[in-house]
UniProtKB/Swiss-Prot annotation:
Gene designation: DDX21
UniProt name for this protein: Nucleolar RNA helicase 2
Region called Disordered, residue ranges: 1-188, 708-783
Organism ancestry: Eukaryota, Metazoa, Chordata, Craniata, Vertebrata
Major enzyme class: hydrolase
Motif Q motif mapped to chain: 186-214
Length: 783
């Protein structure tokens, strides 16, 4: 009986194994039969996997491994997961048939062709292909929700808003990113400025506050004392004008007749006072603004005081006169502004300013008016003097600070070495090249006489007028208005036009000589390059003024680019451009009257020759003097002798010149100086000798000779009048003599020796010595 049971159990197990093998074989056969049909579906799945990379990872986790497939348990699972076609109910089959078209829609017609003929490439598989997907059943029975759109290869949820709103938001964000930081900080919305004032500011072209205006607004508006320093042309006037006007607008005012001013603004010049007054008037229609300065009748000013004044702008002299006459009451002052404070507190105005302010100020009183000091230059002594007018808790805003460059960063600084006898003619050429007939130029002179003479010099081809203290005030105002309006292009002025004047579109500023103090240079150069525009400032200097130029460089934190006078080529090129622009301004009605003459001229000379002659005559460049690029002397041409190695001394160049051109070249070469790095020299020769020199000279591997078209870069500025020199004029240091021998100063003949020693007499030596070291020392240090 037990044996029978064992045999029965063994038979049952054998039967079960046979059934399992039979079932496995049937399943494999069915898979082989279904494989061709499922190829296409698998390709669809692969296509979907490229679209949904995350789903592919889920599939891999869901599919069993080969090891699991071989185990009995896995076989049962597989059997359940993949029932045969016979086991599928008719209802399930019908559902599958309905969902098959949805799966087919996923694949584009182009993809279908690829899957039928060949397998897709790696690029096609890897490339993201965003598609709108509905819920669909995959081969493993999993369902997938509608897929979000892909953006840059990654899922990206659809926005709640419509596409036009999204695009507008993106464009707005881009615009915000493009707005400079200065405009964001200076936006009107950041400050308590009324809509009426904003409208008036926009009428002046102001759409946001400049940095100095933004950083000082709240200090001024809150009533704090302030010292502010910023570069020229950055909008310092509106820095105090806007907040003061808003403050007065917000206060209840008794606008009765004869009221005393609440704001006093003192300026050093009449022109600046007039300009500041206009700036106030342009941005307020409710307040009464008056401007008092010398050279104008008293009657009109008395009438303004009788009617009542809210804001008074003026120069110290006329304000002081009204106080002494008992006509002007300053006891009600709440705000005092000193514009260009360094000049207002200097020796020329200090006594007058103190007398004016003593009326409204009490010593060590917290009830004194609010004091506002503005300038582009604030030396240390200004702070010491200003403290007696300011409260102990004053604010300081400095947009220059410890920065090296004190001048406007939009101005290019150039320097031309020129003897005073040639200066007027060279200035005329400089205006042609750097400004032209259509541009505006301001020339600053040290004296009234020089300004008057230069404005009438025939070398300046453009219309020019002068502006200085000897001109009646009425004429000064007419002249300044004409220059602003473009009635003439060149203004020759003394320092009356140096400070504060905001003249639009000044292309060029010329200083006839280095100023005595660096503050004057900073303010003069600041007449160009204003409000973001670029400009050029050219300073003329003589050999004896080179030390002053170096001092300006060091104190103003700038570096002059030493240039030569404009060459004939540059002058003609600039003049022709001006002439062409002038042709555009000729009306068609005038042209018709000259057509017959033009046709006749073309027949005689040809079109090009006739037009070239006409342009030359229009430009005034019928004859252009050739000038030295080194010292501006007329009748000379500058030549460059380049050397392939660094020259030990200047006699090295003399030796080569004499070998090729003969000893007579000694009398023709003038003012030889080293090029940068001592890789050659440049010198002047008479214009008549240029052709002869070029014919005799032959370039070699070491030496090349050419005519200079612009001033080459020379071997460093000679600071303090010392160092090695290659010019006949000079100071202490070595000299490059004309005979080609290097000697110490004090030797004109004989062997090389110590300073002051000569083989040929002592008196001349002593005189030479005195002209050397002692003389240059006194020049350098003002002794």
């Amino acid at each position: 009986m037990p044996g029978k049971l064992r045999s029965d159990a063994g038979l049952e197990s054998d039967t079960a194994m046979k059934k399992g093998e039979t079932l496995r074989k049937q399943t494999e056969e069915k898979e082989k039969k279904e494989k061709p049909k499922s190829d296409k579906t698998e390709e669809i799945a692969e296509e979907e996997e490229t679209v949904f990379p995350k789903a592919k990872q889920v599939k891999k986790k869901a599919e069993p491994s080969e090891v699991d497939m071989n185990s009995p348990k896995s076989k049962k699972a597989k059997k359940k997961e993949e029932p045969s076609q016979n086991d599928i109910s008719p209802k399930t089959k019908s559902l599958r048939k309905k969902k098959e078209p949805i799966e087919k829609k996923v694949v584009s017609s182009k993809t279908k062709k690829v899957t039928k003929n060949e397998e897709p490439s790696e690029e096609e598989i890897d490339a993201p292909k965003p598609k709108k997907m509905k819920k669909e059943k995959e081969m493993n029975g999993e369902t997938r929700e509608k897929s979000p759109k892909l953006k840059n290869g990654f899922p990206h949820p659809e926005p709640d808003c419509n596409p036009s709103e999204a695009a507008s938001e993106e464009s707005n964000s881009e615009i915000e990113q493009e707005i400079p930081v200065e405009q964001k900080e200076g936006a009107f919305s950041n400050f308590p400025i009324s809509e009426e004032t904003i409208k008036l500011l926009k009428g002046r072209g102001v759409t946001f506050l400049f940095p100095i205006q933004a950083k000082t607004f709240h200090h001024v508006y809150s009533g704090k004392d302030l010292i502010a320093q910023a570069r020229t042309g950055t909008g310092k006037t509106f820095s105090f004008a806007i907040p003061l006007i808003e403050k007065l607008h917000g206060e209840l005012q008794d606008r009765k007749r004869g009221r005393a001013p609440q704001v006093l603004v003192l300026a050093p010049t009449r022109e600046l006072a007039n300009q500041v007054s206009k700036d106030f008037s342009d941005i307020t229609k409710k307040l009464s603004v008056a401007c008092f300065y010398g050279g104008t009748p008293y009657g009109g000013q008395f009438e303004r005081m009788r009617n009542g004044i809210d804001i008074l702008v003026g120069t110290p002299g006329r304000i002081k006169d009204h106080i002494q006459n008992g006509k002007l009451d300053l006891t009600k002052l709440k705000h005092v502004v000193l514009d260009e404070v360094d000049q207002m507190l200097d020796m020329g105005f200090a006594d007058q300013v103190e007398e004016i302010l003593s009326v409204a100020y009490k010593k060590d009183s917290e009830d004194n008016p609010q004091t506002l000091l503005f300038s582009a230059t604030c030396p240390h002594w200004v702070f010491n003097v200003a403290k007696k007018y300011m409260k102990s808790t004053y604010e300081q805003v400095d947009l220059i600070g410890k920065k090296t460059q004190k001048t406007a960063i939009t101005v290019e600084h150039l320097a031309i070495k020129c003897h005073w006898t040639q200066r007027a003619a060279v200035i005329g050429d400089v205006i042609r090249v750097y400004s032209g007939h259509q541009g505006r130029t301001i020339i600053f002179c040290e004296t009234k006489k020089e300004a008057q003479e230069l404005s009438q010099n025939s070398a300046i081809k453009q219309d020019a007028q002068s502006l200085h203290g000897d001109i009646p005030q009425k004429q000064r105002e007419i002249t300044l208005k004409g220059f602003r309006n473009g009635s003439f292009g060149v203004l020759v002025a003394t320092n009356v036009a140096a400070r504060g004047l905001d003249i639009p579109e000044v292309d060029l500023v010329i200083q006839s000589s280095p100023p005595k103090d660096v503050e004057s240079y900073i303010h003069r150069s600041g007449r160009t390059g204003r409000a973001g525009r670029t400009g050029v400032c050219i300073c003329f200097y003589q050999h004896k003024e080179e030390y002053q130029l170096v001092q300006v460089e060091q104190k103003a934190g700038i570096k002059f680019k030493r240039i030569g006078v404009p060459s004939a080529t540059e002058i003609i090129k600039a003049s022709s451009k001006d002439a062409i622009r002038l042709l555009d301004s000729v009306p068609p009605t005038a042209i018709s009257h000259f057509k017959q003459s033009a046709e006749k001229l073309i027949e005689e000379k040809g079109a090009v020759e006739a037009l070239a002659a006409a342009l030359a005559h229009i430009s005034g460049a019928t004859s252009v003097d050739q000038r030295s690029l080194i010292n501006s002397n007329v009748g000379f041409v500058t030549m460059i002798l380049q050397c392939s190695i660094e020259m030990p001394n200047i006699s090295y160049a003399w030796k080569e010149l004499k070998e090729q051109l003969g000893e007579e070249i000694d009398s023709k070469v003038k003012g030889m100086v080293f090029l940068k790095g001592k890789l050659g020299v440049c010198f002047d020769v008479p214009t008549a000798s240029v052709t002869e020199i070029q014919e005799k000279w032959h370039d070699s591997r070491r030496w090349q000779l050419s005519v200079a078209t612009e001033q080459p870069e020379l071997e460093g500025p000679r600071e303090g009048y010392g160092g090695f020199r290659g010019q006949r004029e000079g100071s202490r240091g070595f000299r490059g003599q004309r005979d080609g021998n290097r000697r110490f100063r004090g030797q004109r003949e004989g062997s090389r020796g110590p300073r002051g020693q000569r083989s040929g007499g002592g008196n001349k030596s002593n005189r030479s010595q005195n002209k050397g070291q002692k003389r240059s020392f006194s020049k350098a240090f003002g002794q």
